[in-house]
Regions:
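Positively charged n-region of N-terminal signal peptides that target proteins for export
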Residues: 1-5
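Bacterial N-terminal signal peptides
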Residues: 10-20
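Sec-dependent signal peptide cleavage junction
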Residues: 19-36
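Short, surface-exposed binding/anchoring microloops in extracellular/periplasmic proteins
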Residues: 36-75
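Short beta-strand segments and strand-loop junctions that repeat across beta-rich extracellular domains
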Residues: 70-83, 118
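Solvent-exposed serine/threonine-rich low-complexity stretches and specific carbohydrate-binding patches
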Residues: 73, 84-98
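Surface-exposed, short loops/turns at beta-strand junctions within beta-sandwich domains
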Residues: 99, 105-114
Length: 141
C-alpha cells in the first residue's frame, strides 16, 4: 500500500514538473504572431516631472497592402489601490502604410501619481483581417 501511494505521489510530482517546463517554454519562446497588414510597430509612454506626458506611436505596414489604422489612446490615473480614473481617451484615424507621431497630454491638472497608458492599433489593409496590436505601460510623476 505504501509503495502504491509513493508511486502516485512521485507520478504527480513528475507531471507537475513536466507541465511547468512546457509552460515556461511556451512563455519565453519570443515568437511574434504573423500580422496580415503590419510589419512592425513601436509605442512608448513617458511623463515629465511637470506632468507633461508623451505617447509615441509608430507603425510600418506592407507596401500596397496596408491602408491605414485607428489608434486609440487611453490614459488612466491610479486613484486608490486598484481603482483607475480615465483622464484621456482619444481616437485617431490615419491613412497610409506608415505613420509616426507623438501625442502630448498635460496631466498636471490631475496631480502627481501613477498613470497607465493603453494604446490599441487596429491596422487595416488588403492582407486579411485587421491587426489589433495592444500596448500598456505605467509611468509616474
Amino acid at each position: 500500500m505504501k509503495k502504491k501511494i509513493l508511486s502516485i505521489v512521485a507520478l504527480v510530482f513528475v507531471a507537475i514538473f513536466a507541465l511547468q517546463v512546457i509552460a515556461l517554454a511556451a512563455q519565453s519562446s519570443g515568437i511574434s504572431p504573423l500580422n496580415n497588414n503590419v510589419l512592425s510597430s513601436f509605442t512608448d509612454f513617458s511623463i515629465s516631472k511637470t506632468g507633461n506626458s508623451e505617447v509615441d506611436v509608430n507603425y510600418t505596414g506592407y507596401p500596397n497592402i496596408t491602408t491605414g489604422a485607428t489608434i486609440t489612446v487611453t490614459i488612466k490615473k491610479n486613484t486608490f489601490l486598484f481603482f483607475w480614473s480615465e483622464v484621456v481617451n482619444e481616437t485617431y484615424v490615419v491613412v497610409g502604410e506608415k505613420y509616426r507621431n507623438t501625442y502630448s497630454y498635460d496631466l498636471s491638472s490631475h496631480g502627481p501619481g501613477k498613470y497607465r497608458c493603453n494604446v490599441t492599433y487596429t491596422i487595416s489593409g488588403s492582407g486579411g483581417a485587421d491587426d489589433v496590436i495592444p500596448f500598456e505601460k505605467d509611468a509616474s510623476y
